Amino acid sequence: MWRRLAFVVSNAAVLVLFPATSVPAAQSGTAEEAKAMLERAVAAVKKDKVKALDLFNTGDSRFRDRDLYVFCANVSDGVLTAHPTIRGKTLQDLEGKHGAEFGQEIMQEATEGMIKETTYWWPRAGSDQPLEKTTFYTKVGDQICGVGYYQK
Protein backbone atom coordinates (compact mmCIF):
# COMPACT_ATOMS: atom_id res chain seq x y z
CA MET A 1 0.00 0.00 0.00
CA TRP A 2 2.80 2.41 0.88
CA ARG A 3 4.45 1.76 -2.48
CA ARG A 4 1.22 2.60 -4.27
CA LEU A 5 0.80 5.80 -2.23
CA ALA A 6 4.42 6.79 -2.91
CA PHE A 7 3.87 6.18 -6.63
CA VAL A 8 0.74 8.37 -6.68
CA VAL A 9 2.43 11.15 -4.69
CA SER A 10 5.54 11.14 -6.90
CA ASN A 11 3.42 11.28 -10.07
CA ALA A 12 1.37 14.14 -8.62
CA ALA A 13 4.61 15.99 -7.85
CA VAL A 14 5.76 15.55 -11.45
CA LEU A 15 2.47 16.99 -12.73
CA VAL A 16 2.76 19.98 -10.39
CA LEU A 17 6.40 20.66 -11.22
CA PHE A 18 6.09 20.04 -14.97
CA PRO A 19 2.49 20.85 -15.92
CA ALA A 20 1.37 19.83 -19.41
CA THR A 21 4.62 20.45 -21.21
CA SER A 22 3.22 18.90 -24.38
CA VAL A 23 0.04 20.99 -24.52
CA PRO A 24 1.44 23.88 -26.60
CA ALA A 25 2.58 21.47 -29.30
CA ALA A 26 -0.85 19.83 -29.29
CA GLN A 27 -2.45 23.24 -29.84
CA SER A 28 -0.50 23.78 -33.05
CA GLY A 29 -0.62 21.87 -36.29
CA THR A 30 2.53 20.31 -37.71
CA ALA A 31 4.10 20.45 -41.16
CA GLU A 32 2.90 16.93 -41.87
CA GLU A 33 -0.66 17.78 -40.81
CA ALA A 34 -0.65 20.96 -42.90
CA LYS A 35 0.51 19.12 -46.01
CA ALA A 36 -2.04 16.34 -45.47
CA MET A 37 -4.82 18.92 -45.07
CA LEU A 38 -3.73 20.60 -48.32
CA GLU A 39 -3.81 17.25 -50.11
CA ARG A 40 -7.38 16.67 -48.83
CA ALA A 41 -8.33 20.17 -49.95
CA VAL A 42 -6.92 19.59 -53.45
CA ALA A 43 -8.95 16.38 -53.76
CA ALA A 44 -12.10 18.19 -52.58
CA VAL A 45 -11.64 21.07 -55.06
CA LYS A 46 -11.08 18.63 -57.92
CA LYS A 47 -14.24 16.73 -56.98
CA ASP A 48 -16.56 19.74 -56.49
CA LYS A 49 -15.03 23.22 -56.23
CA VAL A 50 -18.19 25.01 -55.05
CA LYS A 51 -18.86 22.49 -52.28
CA ALA A 52 -15.17 22.45 -51.28
CA LEU A 53 -14.97 26.24 -50.94
CA ASP A 54 -18.13 26.17 -48.83
CA LEU A 55 -16.61 23.49 -46.57
CA PHE A 56 -13.39 25.52 -46.21
CA ASN A 57 -15.33 28.68 -45.32
CA THR A 58 -17.71 27.03 -42.85
CA GLY A 59 -14.87 25.43 -40.91
CA ASP A 60 -15.52 21.76 -41.64
CA SER A 61 -13.25 19.80 -39.29
CA ARG A 62 -11.46 18.10 -42.20
CA PHE A 63 -10.27 21.54 -43.30
CA ARG A 64 -9.86 23.44 -40.03
CA ASP A 65 -7.97 21.99 -37.08
CA ARG A 66 -6.46 24.07 -34.27
CA ASP A 67 -4.40 26.72 -36.10
CA LEU A 68 -4.50 24.92 -39.47
CA TYR A 69 -7.00 26.01 -42.11
CA VAL A 70 -7.36 25.99 -45.89
CA PHE A 71 -7.29 29.21 -47.88
CA CYS A 72 -7.92 29.55 -51.61
CA ALA A 73 -7.78 32.39 -54.13
CA ASN A 74 -8.79 32.85 -57.75
CA VAL A 75 -5.85 32.36 -60.11
CA SER A 76 -7.13 35.20 -62.32
CA ASP A 77 -7.31 38.05 -59.80
CA GLY A 78 -6.02 36.69 -56.47
CA VAL A 79 -9.29 37.33 -54.60
CA LEU A 80 -9.48 35.00 -51.61
CA THR A 81 -12.42 32.65 -52.11
CA ALA A 82 -11.78 30.77 -48.85
CA HIS A 83 -10.25 32.07 -45.63
CA PRO A 84 -11.46 32.18 -42.01
CA THR A 85 -11.15 35.97 -41.64
CA ILE A 86 -10.04 37.80 -44.81
CA ARG A 87 -12.11 36.25 -47.60
CA GLY A 88 -12.61 38.76 -50.41
CA LYS A 89 -9.21 40.42 -50.00
CA THR A 90 -6.54 39.85 -52.62
CA LEU A 91 -3.76 37.36 -52.02
CA GLN A 92 -1.10 39.40 -53.81
CA ASP A 93 -1.67 42.33 -51.42
CA LEU A 94 -0.88 40.25 -48.32
CA GLU A 95 2.43 40.93 -46.64
CA GLY A 96 3.85 39.26 -43.60
CA LYS A 97 5.54 41.25 -40.87
CA HIS A 98 9.04 42.42 -41.83
CA GLY A 99 7.80 43.14 -45.39
CA ALA A 100 7.69 39.62 -46.85
CA GLU A 101 5.36 39.76 -49.87
CA PHE A 102 4.35 36.13 -49.57
CA GLY A 103 0.97 36.59 -51.28
CA GLN A 104 2.60 37.83 -54.46
CA GLU A 105 5.11 34.96 -54.31
CA ILE A 106 2.29 32.41 -53.96
CA MET A 107 0.41 33.95 -56.92
CA GLN A 108 3.51 33.83 -59.15
CA GLU A 109 4.90 30.46 -58.11
CA ALA A 110 1.81 28.23 -57.70
CA THR A 111 1.95 25.31 -60.12
CA GLU A 112 -0.67 22.67 -60.86
CA GLY A 113 0.32 19.30 -59.39
CA MET A 114 3.26 20.66 -57.35
CA ILE A 115 3.17 21.56 -53.67
CA LYS A 116 5.50 24.46 -52.94
CA GLU A 117 6.21 26.29 -49.70
CA THR A 118 7.01 29.76 -48.47
CA THR A 119 7.90 31.09 -45.01
CA TYR A 120 6.94 34.47 -43.58
CA TRP A 121 5.94 36.12 -40.28
CA TRP A 122 2.21 36.24 -39.49
CA PRO A 123 0.23 36.60 -36.23
CA ARG A 124 -1.94 33.78 -34.91
CA ALA A 125 -5.68 34.44 -34.83
CA GLY A 126 -6.49 36.75 -31.94
CA SER A 127 -2.94 38.09 -31.63
CA ASP A 128 -0.84 40.80 -33.23
CA GLN A 129 2.46 39.13 -32.30
CA PRO A 130 4.02 37.84 -35.56
CA LEU A 131 5.40 34.30 -35.56
CA GLU A 132 7.26 32.35 -38.20
CA LYS A 133 4.78 30.52 -40.43
CA THR A 134 5.34 28.20 -43.39
CA THR A 135 2.61 27.67 -45.96
CA PHE A 136 2.30 24.81 -48.42
CA TYR A 137 0.42 25.83 -51.57
CA THR A 138 -0.51 24.63 -55.04
CA LYS A 139 -2.65 25.50 -58.03
CA VAL A 140 -5.88 23.49 -58.49
CA GLY A 141 -7.73 24.42 -61.68
CA ASP A 142 -8.67 28.09 -61.35
CA GLN A 143 -7.79 28.20 -57.63
CA ILE A 144 -4.60 28.52 -55.63
CA CYS A 145 -5.00 26.75 -52.28
CA GLY A 146 -2.74 26.59 -49.27
CA VAL A 147 -2.41 25.53 -45.65
CA GLY A 148 0.14 27.04 -43.27
CA TYR A 149 1.57 26.03 -39.92
CA TYR A 150 3.47 27.96 -37.26
CA GLN A 151 7.08 27.00 -36.58
CA LYS A 152 6.63 27.35 -32.79
Model-flagged regions — what are they?
Residues W2-K152:
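N-terminal membrane-sensor/transducer module of prokaryotic signaling receptors
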